[in-house]
Curated annotation (Swiss-Prot):
Gene that encodes it: Mctp
Tissue distribution of the protein: Motor neurons (at protein level).
Organism of provenance: Drosophila melanogaster (Fruit fly)
Keyword check for Nuclease: no
Protein name: Multiple C2 and transmembrane domain-containing protein
Start-end of Polar residues biased regions: 38-49
Amino acid sequence: MSRIQYVDQVDQVELDQQQQPGSSSTVSGSTPPLQISPHGSPSLQQSQRLGKHLSKSASELNGHDCHLSESPHISPKRAKSAVAQQLAGVSSGGVASGVGVLQKTHGFFNNLRHRWSRAKSKDRLGRKSPSDFLEESTDYAADYSSEGSSVTHSPRHRSTTIGGSPLAREFRATAKMAQVIQRFGGSMEGRIDEHPENGSAGCSPPELSTQQQLEALQANELRRKREAQLRQFVFFQLRVHLKSGSDLVAMDKNGLSDPYVKFKVGGRLLHKSRTIHRDLNPVWDEVFIVPIEDPFQPIIVKVFDYDWGLQDDFMGSAKLDLTQLELGKAEDIHLQLCDSSGNGGSGLGEILINLTLWPRSQEDKEMHFQRNSKLAESSKRLKSQIWSSVVTILLVKAKDLPLAEDGSKLNDTHFKFRLGNEKYKSKSSWTERWLEQFDLHLFDEDQNLEIALWNRNTLYGKAIIDLSVFQRENTHGIWKPLEDCPGEVHLMLTISGTTALETISDLKAFKEDPREAQLLRERYKFLRCLQNLRDVGHLTVKVFGATGLAAADIGGKSDPFCVLELGNARLQTQTEYKTLTPNWNKIFTFNVKDITQVLEITVFDEDRDHRVEFLGKLVIPLLRIKSGVKRWYTLKDKNLCVRAKGNSPQIQLELTVVWSEIRAVCRALQPKEEKLIQQEAKFKRQLFLRNVNRLKEIIMDILDAARYVQSCFEWESPVRSSIAFVFWIVACVYGDLETVPLVLLLIILKNWLVRLITGTTDAAAHYDYEYDEDDDDDKEKEEKKSIKERLQAIQEVSQTVQNTIGYLASLGESTINTFNFSVPELTWLAVVLLLGAILVLHFVPLRWLLLFWGLMKFSRRLLRPNTIPNNELLDFLSRVPDNEEINQYRELPPSAPTDQTRNNPKKKLKGS
């Protein structure tokens, strides 16, 4: 593009500005008035200026009235008009009459009126300059000539692409000028400004400088490229991270505000943030994703102050121009808030947000609106899952956390987790140990788990975990260091519940490899039993489906999913919607660390807001598993006592366990792995009574054994006492320390023989059925009992527990008081007895002492039939008082009446 064409465009813009009323142009009347010389004629300079303006004809106002001498194309000089020649003659002679001045003025205004009418006719024609064409915006989805057509191929822009049209010439000239500007940078500006005819040859200077016009052309060209790039996509997703606000305006009487933010597009609400109470520098820290169909439509951001029961106060607003964003790149934006009239100011504050605009295809658009449409397919997967996996997080503990300003521990420490749009806040703890478990849903777009350490309202540190690097269907123990502060957090993380068919956990895509099965069996052979002692075995669980589940929803259906737990490892299936007979068809694998562990299988119903309802539970010890057998298991209730609700609910499983016996034996002699998440026990009347009865049964068994031995001493059955007497003598004469385990082994052998003879192979299962019947009977009896009877039963059990605890406490205190001279006489007696025991045990073997003690017990009935059977040690301790008795034996010091009056101020006032 030549420079003369550029200056012609500038003159055209200047002429349009001159034709507007109120502008500072010579045509509108801002030209300084004609000054008459002392001789009664205009000055020479004013005459030349007036002649230059009058020499322009109406046709010359179309664009070419200023010429650059350096231009290669010089326009021919125009002939001066008659008025101009007369003015020139007047200026040369210096004499003019008053009539000549009036004629010249009259001709000037006629010419001005002619040019004004020509300008108005051009405005009606609607001809636009290149700058107007660049500033014109088009509707986003208006042109769809073809799928591969660009913006200039659309019918709306044919006027700029036809080679012979004036608009096409202007469009090409503007594009060429932009290329020159981009190539030479600021050198072009200097050349135009340095031209001798700029501002000195009669051309009035434009309102905008050349630098500003060049920047405007560059900005328009960049905007045009971005718009062309945006038009290549039909759908977008905008990720908005609302971080914080600063220096917001105070709307309440206390000098604070309760701000929240609304995001709107075309009057439609996209998102509403939570309210931060009493804060002018709020930290929302919220992330959400919204669909964008028209990126040329700005997003309106409004901030309000929440008022309970009243209308919320407006605090400021701002606009988001999505065309300024780079696709796929996260950008931090500071939004300066302005009032409703559009006047901004530092007093209204600003909002800090992070934006990422992702382009999406037509298929993604259809899939998005199909998921969100209420009239989508109404099959059994009506509530189709849009998440890909479930992330189960167990917050265990933290260490080396920062200290408070005074050097003490933080007393209100908690963690906040965020995965996409979902968030979780843990409980506050000052012990740095939480043991909380929760689930978050994993989406394909965002797989970064954000962790933040808070103490009250203060943020101390953050950490980000990339979930894409972790193996699915496996539990991982993680120690994650925190950023911006010292400390680490311990997590147990599991990614399960995958819905894709191509995952390894899907039975339809699973093909059993005989070579892998053989390698798995060889890993736990006897020859390799000492290689890795912690790897006890391998468990494979195939979950096919369930039937007869209870209806948890209003429509008589449920949304069941299955959770499998082995120790602290936790996996789960996907959710099957609107069914009572789900088919999960999943396969899971567990690393067995202890063969004595149990596999817990629980079926839940999924509700909104991550809430679940219990449908059934099953517990299977690993030692009872029959490998490779596909069978149905009955689901039980929460207490694992009776059948769960529903139509005989069952679950179909196939379990396979491979383990090493030597490793299992070594592991059984080590501490058992503690399960981190356990259900918190609450006080229940029935549970309390049941536990007391269990303890009572054990105590009664011990008492029965003691009575059996005492009956042998009392010769209630001569045959039984004779056998016991002979057995005691033989054991004392020939017995040794190995006799103790031999006796225990004989007890086990006796129980095994009883089980073998009676043929009972599964006593636990038989007990479950009886327990179910007893439990049903207990429920019926409980319903018939009155409140008085229930309270009386609780009172009796509580009294028994109270007396037992009191007896044990008294016995322990008496033993302690024996050694601390609470009763000196009894303590010295204990000293004498202990000295005698030392001498006897030193000179007499233990077996002879036991033999003598047995003879005394067996002969008491024969030699001393009237004596009362007793225990000498308990008889001695019963003579020693406990702490309560010592307090009761203590004497009070005698006191005078004056002391009593002084100690009782009420009596003193009454007497006075």
